[in-house]
Amino acid sequence: MALQVELIPTGEIIRVVHPHRPCKLALGSDGVRVTMESALTARDRVGVQDFVLLENFTSEAAFIENLRRRFRENLIYTYIGPVLVSVNPYRDLQIYSRQHMERYRGVSFYEVPPHLFAVADTVYRALRTERRDQAVMISGESGAGKTEATKRLLQFYAETCPAPERGGAVRDRLLQSNPVLEAFGNAKTLRNDNSSRFGKYMDVQFDFKGAPVGGHILSYLLEKSRVVHQNHGERNFHVFYQLLEGGEEETLRRLGLERNPQSYLYLVKGQCAKVSSINDKSDWKVMRKALSVIDFTEDEVEDLLSIVASVLHLGNIHFAADEDSNAQVTTENQLKYLTRLLGVEGTTLREALTHRKIIAKGEELLSPLNLEQAAYARDALAKAVYSRTFTWLVRKINRSLASKDAESPSWRSTTVLGLLDIYGFEVFQHNSFEQFCINYCNEKLQQLFIELTLKSEQEEYEAEGIAWEPVQYFNNKIICDLVEEKFKGIISILDEECLRPGEATDLTFLEKLEDTVKPHPHFLTHKLADQKTRKSLDRGEFRLLHYAGEVTYSVTGFLDKNNDLLFRNLKETMCSSMNPIMAQCFDKSELSDKKRPETVATQFKMSLLQLVEILRSKEPAYIRCIKPNDAKQPGRFDEVLIRHQVKYLGLMENLRVRRAGFAYRRKYEAFLQRYKSLCPETWPMWAGRPQDGVAVLVRHLGYKPEEYKMGRTKIFIRFPKTLFATEDSLEVRRQSLATKIQAAWRGFHWRQKFLRVKRSAICIQSWWRGTLGRRKAAKRKWAAQTIRRLIRGFILRHSPRCPENAFFLDHVRASFLLNLRRQLPRNVLDTSWPTPPPALREASELLRELCMKNMVWKYCRSISPEWKQQLQQKAVASEIFKGKKDNYPQSVPRLFISTRLGTEEISPRVLQSLGSEPIQYAVPVVKYDRKGYKPRPRQLLLTPSAVVIVEDAKVKQRIDYANLTGISVSSLSDSLFVLHVQREDNKQKGDVVLQSDHVIETLTKTALSADRVNNININQGSITFAGGPGRDGIIDFTSGSELLITKAKNGHLAVVAPRLNSR
């Protein structure tokens, strides 16, 4: 085993337990994890983990460069004190697994590298230990990763918190509320494919055990104008596309929808229905499953989808002008679907879309609408239906998340953790009413942030007994007052202009702003600006100098969006809806309420003030999300875009406030445990109080009085360079410590190994000696008994088997069988066999027979098909000629060849005449005439059905096997043979006399092909053959010194052949 000490960017010591499974332990000098300080040694490459430790903390360039270094190394999280800055990597970094959750669970904030889970765990532990409500505020630009951060936080709490006693239903509903809210509240924008188009604040309630038992969601400023209009390259809310793509055929048929989004006016304006990064079909399945988890009944789902479909049908309602220029509905089919889906009367809806009800002096009058007004009424209804449905949806989810134990006494012991996912500061080329509200929201949150940050800093200084140094910072209360002040604020002026009688327009609102607000250091219009500034301001614009910079707003649409008017008769129509959800969204009490509803800006202001109070009552934690580029590409760092976000998120102001006093503070125990190795007096162990040990340590390190302060429980270090110098000294010291640790470890390890080996050797020796002694004694005893039994058996070996000789006889038999196993015959020709004892003679013969059969069987199994055919032919030749023909022994060692003539040696005309008949064997022969016995060269061909005699390119004779009656050959060494044919066959001229140099091979193959093995006659003396019709010929055979074939004087063919073998 080896101990490997290595300094890596996270400051971890790696102990290698297994070569393929390193065990990582983040250790200080005596085992305390202080990862943040450890990472300082790699700061030149990966930057600092806390911006507070930047030397040039006032430099925006240094701030961004530190972000760049960390982003380049896939380190997307960095702290500004307790604030977490997150850069969206646009890819999965595999840092959110269960293993990562366990790594951050129950660990101090600075003991592990910056991570979302570190913030989540710190907040959760504070909630449990201090019993104080907590809040995590997540802000950033669209596409910066706010929604993803919220989901990861919920995932962390769902995985790591203890399960409630009544199961994990609340936990599942908290998680499953996200897909539903994303479907109805998120959309694809130019900056983000899953952009939240509303602000969300979620409370998660925990019981005294730390288990989630309930929740509540607040939504802010849904962008309902997106329902009726989208910019180029953007989409409507996800749910519309999910329904069309993933909805079942039966559902779409019931809703009167078709799958093509291009068929719906509200879905085509952005010209971006399909997005490669979005799988609407899969998201639909997730959303539908989530609805069932959060207690939606099938009827409620059906009613909800009917409303979604009704918005699409409403967008397809078209109008045409009659002769009085009044609008009339021309799309009857869409109107029919609308009345059914919304549960209203068709005539009532038609009238509400084309007329406006006016109440004057107690009388109700219907005023017809022109085309423009009708389109406005239609779009206003669509926005109202969708936005109110969204509000109902949030209420429904809240009912599902509400704790069932709210009435029990233990409910008082619950604590709340709030998650705020809110839009970041927005500055576009064209900024309107929505950006005004969003930026006002950010101003209020920035005001709260500065207030709570300064308060937290001041409380920590006071608790530690450190003198508080006033911090100079920009107080944006002046901007908040400019927007929200009663009577003189922008919202009040906007409301007044919306409510006053007469012809109010966006420009009259701007004129009133100029008259009321001027002069103001943070407000500017074309009229109030100087000559130079007027060039950048149109007459219909005003500019606010926010904490994050200047933003120019166009007043176009301010009054309309703030009023958010819905004609009375449209409200009446929707109040009569038979759709249960619509009936809840449009309460009939609205009709009897004569009070004018609050404007959108006022509603938002009141909601925001309520939110600020909620957040002020909690202990805050902050996550600032940054988008690295607009192209959503991984690894791309757009410095201009990031500088813009750093400015609008107020990160430099945040850092400046944090650095106004001391840059670094740490508990005495942690500081001493990390750096005590730098001082001989504190190393290796300090026996006194940690505070006294730190005092000794800093004196040894030479800290100047202005560089640090000693608090009650912490040391405060003013400058990062002081900490860097200390960390660099520790790095040098650590190298020597690592060497000493390795040396001590090796010595200890090898000594322990030696002692183990020594103890093992002594134990093994002792055991082995005993074992050998016992084995020796047992062997001697066994040997004596065996010898005694063998002698007794030998004496009685000829007696019948009895207990006295059974052992001996078994020994003899076993010995024979073992000897036989070693001396088995090696092949079929080996006839050796050991002599068996008398008792095994019969068994020996049986074994010998079995052995021979086995060898023969193995030999037969091993031969190839070609060799098998060769042996079969040789066996037939042996059966025919062995002991009968004198030259047979000379043919035995010669292999039979498949053919003696190649195809190229046979005339093509002969092959053509044979047709498809294959040639099985071909050999050159000599034919002797039947009369004069003149020899003539010929070719003998064997086919499957006949023997063919060929002369050059001509078939001279064909003898079918059926007409071949026999074959004659002499017993001498000559090579003549006669093929006998039927005399009755008129086609044949007579028997054929042939001579072949390979007579044994030729006759064997002919006999096999013609199936005439038993028809070969071996004659002695002479052979008689049919020479023609009514005439026979005779061949006489005699022995001589050499082969001679001639015609004798008696007219016979005389053959003299030498005798090769003695009989």
Swiss-Prot record:
Induction: Up-regulated by serum. It is found in: Cytoplasm; Nucleus; Cytoplasm, Cell cortex; Cell projection, Stereocilium membrane. PANTHER family: MYOSIN, UNCONVENTIONAL MYOSIN-IC. The lineage of its organism: Eukaryota, Metazoa, Chordata, Craniata, Vertebrata. Residues 734-757, 758-786 form the IQ domain. It comes from the Eukaryota. Changing residue 938 to A: Inhibits binding to PIP2 and disrupts membrane binding. Gene3D superfamilies: 1.10.10.820, 1.20.5.190, 1.20.58.530, 6.20.240.20, Kinesin motor domain, Myosin VI head, motor domain, U50 subdomain. Isoform 3 is expressed in small intestine, pancreas, brain, kidney, skin, heart muscle, testis, striated muscle, spleen, liver and lung (at protein level). Expressed in brain, testis, adrenal glands, thymus, spleen, kidney, lung, heart, cochlea and vestibule. Expressed in sensory hair cells of the inner ear. Expressed in adipocytes. The gene is Myo1c. Keywords: Acetylation, Actin-binding, ATP-binding, Calmodulin-binding, Cell membrane, Cell projection, Cytoplasm, Cytoplasmic vesicle, Membrane, Methylation, Motor protein, Myosin, Nucleotide-binding, Nucleus, Phosphoprotein, Repeat. It comes from Mus musculus (Mouse). Residues 885-1059 form the TH1 domain. One of its GO terms (molecular function) is ATP binding. This is Unconventional myosin-Ic. GO terms for biological process: cellular response to type II interferon; chromatin remodeling; positive regulation of cell migration; positive regulation of cellular response to insulin stimulus; positive regulation of protein targeting to membrane; positive regulation of transcription by RNA polymerase I; positive regulation of transcription by RNA polymerase II; positive regulation of transcription by RNA polymerase III. The keyword Translocase does not apply. ATP binds at residues 88, 96, 139-148, 192-196. GO terms for cellular component: B-WICH complex; basal plasma membrane; brush border; cell cortex; cytoplasmic vesicle membrane; cytosol; filamentous actin; lateral plasma membrane. The modification N6-methyllysine is found at residue 383. The modification Phosphoserine is found at residues 408, 536, 864, 1041. Binds directly to large unilamellar vesicles (LUVs) containing phosphatidylinositol 4,5-bisphosphate (PIP2) or inositol 1,4,5-trisphosphate (InsP3). The PIP2-binding site corresponds to the myosin tail domain (PH-like) present in its tail domain. The keyword Ribonucleoprotein does not apply. Residues 608-630 are annotated as: Actin-binding. Changing residue 927 to A: Inhibits binding to PIP2 and disrupts membrane binding. Belongs to the TRAFAC class myosin-kinesin ATPase superfamily. Myosin family.
